[in-house]
Amino acid sequence: MQALLAAPLAKAEELNPLLPHAIEIVLSLVVFGLLLFAVWKFVTPRFEQIYTERTQAIEGGLAAAETKQAEADAKLADLEQQLSEARHEAARIREEAREQGAQIIAEMREQAQADAARIVEHGKTQIEAERQQAVTSLRAEVGTLATSLAGRIVGESLEDDDRSARVVERFLADLETIEASQAAGGGES
């Protein structure tokens, strides 16, 4: 009976659908090897080439970006330096303009003071000249009037010019002395 039972069991083992046949295993291994060889020989190098190209492109892009960034930083620093220099130049120009303005104002003030002093001096000179002219004119007129009045009062003719000139000069000198003493006395009180 064992033989009877062993025969169906051996046949059942042979027909087990879960276990593949040996030929299928061998054929699958050959196809897998061919497929592995094709992938290793053709696909992998292409993947490596594409990977290398992309890596180089990315690294080149990064290098270019770093170069551009360095150029941009250099340009920015240059522009900031130029801006700083322009600000310093503008401040220097403003300071020079302020100094020149102050100098011009001082020169104009000095010139105005000199002009005012010159005008005052000219006015004083002109007034002094007019005063001298008036004094001279008054002396001549006062002398003539005083001589004729004195002649009428005294009843004598004072026609002698030398004598009348001396009398007039003495009279005017006395007047000036009186005037000077009054001015000195009036200034003290």
UniProtKB/Swiss-Prot annotation:
Topology term for the membrane: Single-pass membrane protein
Per its UniProt entry, which superkingdom is the organism in?
A: Bacteria
- Which SUPFAM superfamilies is this protein grouped with? F1F0 ATP synthase subunit B, membrane domain (SSF81573)
GO CC list = plasma membrane; proton-transporting ATP synthase complex
**The keyword Membrane is assigned to this record:** yes
- According to the record, the segments passing through the membrane are 23-43
Output the CDD domains linked to this UniProt entry. Answer: ATP-synt_Fo_b
Keyword Ion transport listed? yes
Keywords (A to Z) from UniProt: ATP synthesis, Cell membrane, CF(0), Hydrogen ion transport, Ion transport, Membrane, Transmembrane, Transmembrane helix, Transport
Per UniProt, what is one GO molecular function of this protein? proton-transporting ATPase activity, rotational mechanism
> Where is this protein localized, as stated in its record?
Cell membrane
Q: What is its main location?
A: membrane
Q: What InterPro entries does the record point to?
A: ATP_synth_B-like_membr_sf (IPR028987), ATP_synth_b/b'su_bac/chlpt (IPR002146), ATP_synth_F0_bsu_bac (IPR005864), ATP_synthase_B_chain (IPR050059)
Which Gene3D superfamilies does the UniProt record give? F1F0 ATP synthase subunit B, membrane domain (1.20.5.620)
Q: What does this protein do?
A: F(1)F(0) ATP synthase produces ATP from ADP in the presence of a proton or sodium gradient. F-type ATPases consist of two structural domains, F(1) containing the extramembraneous catalytic core and F(0) containing the membrane proton channel, linked together by a central stalk and a peripheral stalk. During catalysis, ATP synthesis in the catalytic domain of F(1) is coupled via a rotary mechanism of the central stalk subunits to proton translocation.
Q: How does it assemble?
A: F-type ATPases have 2 components, F(1) - the catalytic core - and F(0) - the membrane proton channel. F(1) has five subunits: alpha(3), beta(3), gamma(1), delta(1), epsilon(1). F(0) has three main subunits: a(1), b(2) and c(10-14). The alpha and beta chains form an alternating ring which encloses part of the gamma chain. F(1) is attached to F(0) by a central stalk formed by the gamma and epsilon chains, while a peripheral stalk is formed by the delta and b chains.
Give the family this protein belongs to, as stated in its UniProt record.
Answer: Belongs to the ATPase B chain family.
Query: What is this protein's record name?
Result: ATP synthase subunit b
Q: Source gene? A: atpF
